[in-house]
């Protein structure tokens, strides 16, 4: 399951992942995400803390790291999980690499879970990649008054499945 969302993820993402991940672990789900701060970081941190498999997809070569806030979790993933990149080892981060790597995040997964998303964001790009790849798209419910969940609502309007409990995702994969 790919977990995607805002780089400015709030406690809403924390609470949702804490609620969902124990059930994901019971069915041996692997977590896939980028290595950005926010939702990506939180997804990897929770997965590793629960001894769940976790895969990070870089938007640059292995000899670099960005952002510095996620260096510690990357170090842990290199030992306890998997860190991959389609770029040459010495390739520096470039702005356009991050949307490119989003197709790998969704492509490695049977589905994606959107935690918090603005109406225009990298999360929306990953969502469109997932739809093109015939992946399931799941979304946490959001508020029309919260900028960080307007993208969630747009995804729901486009057919994403709203997640209220772990079984809303797990039942699709059993």
PLM segments and residue spans:
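Glycine-biased, small-residue-rich flexible motifs in mid-sequence functional cores and linkers
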Residues: 1-174
